[in-house]
Amino acid sequence: MKKVFGIAAIVLSFSAVAFADESGLLDKNSGIITKPSKLSVTETMDRVEAAAKGIGANIFARVDYQQLSKKVNVDIRPNQLLIFGRGAAAPYLIKEAPLAGIDMPFKALVWEDSQGKVWVSHTNGSFIDTRYAVKGAASYVKNVDEVIEKIVSEALK
């Protein structure tokens, strides 16, 4: 089961990027924003984690998929997931749309592509709003976007 989960997460993390704007690269189908990093996966994730802690977020997990893949004798490029949150948006959204729990708490994925380039990816809050159409969620979604943007921008300085 862990092998299937790990492989599925890796496949999802490498979805095609379809649109670029001032906020980064956005895959319009998945709602994932992706930005480049000049650092290694580990260094970038260390900075993402520090930035999340810096705004008072709780760190729930940091998953190193490359390390996990070694346990099943699969060789993958560096790929780490951080699960974090402050608890403001999730309860409201989940109360109104229980399936929103699949997208909460926040997640940031730092990964290396086949060219050795490192990327930071996260879900666009507006996509979450569209997916669940929770009435009155606009302020929560705006907060989600602002918090994640602040964390990623700080990490990529």
Specify the residue positions occupied by each region the protein language model found.
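Terminal, regulation- and interaction-focused segments at domain boundaries
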Residues: 20-56
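N-terminal signal peptide c-region/cleavage motif recognized by signal peptidases
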Residues: 13-18
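Beta-strand/loop substructures that line and gate deep hydrophobic ligand-binding cavities in soluble
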Residues: 107-134
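Soluble non-cytosolic domains of exported or imported proteins
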Residues: 38-43, 60, 135-142
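Compact, glycine-rich, soluble single-domain proteins
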Residues: 49, 53-55, 60-106, 110
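Extracytoplasmic/secreted envelope proteins and their assembly/folding machinery
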Residues: 42-45, 49, 66, 145, ...
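Positively charged n-region of N-terminal signal peptides that target proteins for export
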Residues: 1-4
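C-terminal partner/receptor-binding element of secreted or periplasmic proteins
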Residues: 126-157
